[in-house]
Amino acid sequence: KGEASYAPGAACHGADGNSGSPANPKLAGQHPEYLNKQLQEFKSGKRANAIMSGMVAALSPEDMKNISAWLGQQKAKPGFAKDKQTVALGERIYRGGIADRQIPACAGCHSPNGAGLPSQYPRLSGQHADYTTAQLSGFRDGVRQNNLTMTQVAAKLNDREIKAVSDYIAGLR
């Protein structure tokens, strides 16, 4: 059921949820609970995105659960860090945070390998760096407001740190 309902999403997110576009998230292998929450928030307007709001408008709660379950069963393709100059900084932030600025380690919630925790924290490993950068910047700048913790953490990061941690996340396995 989920695959058929997901079909319109393939244009942006890939036939199996592995988006080829760095601007669009990879959804394959993501926790179904997280995906379902995001779909509900696009539909309610709590998470603002004109394209996604239109895509989910006709979906029922059952459709959203089925899509989320199907995407969660797909195999995520690994990503790769691209900037060797910033990946070390990204690793330091991801694994240890920045204590003197009260920035917690990303790994504390999203796990050391980026697997996240079902129903609590999304899987990050292998996600496109461009997408992660856009989301962290959105949280920091108040554009994305559907997670208070992420808004508070991202508010303390500068552009260089966001880019570095995003690139590091892309290469996590």
Predicted regions and their residues:
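Predominantly soluble domains enriched in secretory-pathway, periplasmic, or organellar proteins
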Residues: 1-4, 23, 36, 73, ...
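Axial heme c-ligation environment in periplasmic c-type cytochrome domains
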Residues: 20-26, 41-83, 118-123, 141-173
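The feature marks the first
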Residues: 1-44
